[in-house]
Amino acid sequence: MELNNLKPAAGAKHAKRRVGRGIGSGLGKTAGRGHKGQKSRSGGFHKVGFEGGQMPLQRRLPKRGFTSLTKEFVGEVRLSDLEKLPVDEIDLLALKQAGLVGELTKSAKIIATGELKRKIVVKGLGATKGARAAIEAAGGSFAE
């Protein structure tokens, strides 16, 4: 066996349908499209979602919800995430570098989920009452 002798297995390849090439092929004249009608014509097919003139499903259903303009800009950080950070002074830049908030985030808030056992200094971040109490109980402080 050589590379120039390799061939696909018998029956693995199918010949392309050659339509409109005479009556003897079985696919001559109308090329398997039948007679007349929209689907027999070139370019003759409806657009996606078209239901023959009936009001389409997408337009029958009501609009719902809205797009929040502040979604990407306010981040949430857990106490358990702050525990894992290697730095003691925590601000928005430190959170971005650690990947805890997105690059587009403009402000962040600390929430009281998890535990904090070490002393940290929080600069320029918001915190819930529970989170503030937990940080101060661990010996930490807030610098505005």
UniProtKB/Swiss-Prot annotation:
One of its GO terms (cellular component) is cytosolic large ribosomal subunit. Keywords: Ribonucleoprotein, Ribosomal protein, RNA-binding, rRNA-binding. Residues 1-56 are annotated as: Disordered. Coiled coil: none annotated. InterPro entries: Ribosomal_uL15, Ribosomal_uL15/eL18, Ribosomal_uL15/eL18_sf, Ribosomal_uL15_bac-type, Ribosomal_uL15_CS. Residues 21-31 have a biased composition (Gly residues). GO terms for molecular function: rRNA binding; structural constituent of ribosome. GO terms for biological process: translation. It holds the Pfam family Ribosomal_L27A. HAMAP family: Ribosomal_uL15 (MF_01341). Belongs to the universal ribosomal protein uL15 family. Binds to the 23S rRNA. Part of the 50S ribosomal subunit. This is Large ribosomal subunit protein uL15. The gene is rplO.
